[in-house]
Amino acid sequence: TGGLDTVAVRLPASAAARKLIEYSGGYVAAPSANRSGRPSPTLARYVQEDMDGRVEMILDGGQVGIGLESTIVDLTVSPPQILRPGYVTEERLEQVLEGVDMDAALLNEDSGQAPKAPGMKYRHYAPKGELVVVEGSSDRVAEYINRAAEADRHAGEKTGVLGSRELLAEYRADVIKCVGSRGDEESIARNLFAVLREFDEEGVTKIYSESFSS
């Protein structure tokens, strides 16, 4: 319930998760397999890192098919309200709902309203290092990232770049990671959190990323 008087219901796409629900003979009430303040685990080994000693068993369903956080929508109000943006975008929701709004607390941090959804009230889904997203044309993005990363290295930072396959060869940093081709949004979504965790594992303190918004 997230502290509210409503209940969120989710039907997972994972075949392993569906089998678990089937074998349970009903419904499963459980929190997500991650601790707040870390990138969401997309592999069983990341769940083990976060939950070691806290759970007795981990069901390994392989790499996740999507990888991004789920979209949370409040259907108790009209029009429906997005409480947490996720893989299912506002545009896709509008195709099946007669209009949809965004939670005012997400649009304006100074609104005085507290976000209703888990993960929107504090640092969440974030790597340990500082993450900077750079927007613009491909050549300008690569030029800016390389210049900024060089300055950061001189300042003692361990730098990382999160980039697309198309631009990967253009970057200069201590650690360079590819999340997929710019034309393959599903691949980018599936790999994003795993790559952020890899930056943590390699001790990267400053991460620069291309913008992958469509």
Residue ranges of each PLM-predicted region?
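Active-site-adjacent structural elements in enzyme catalytic cores
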Residues: T1-S214
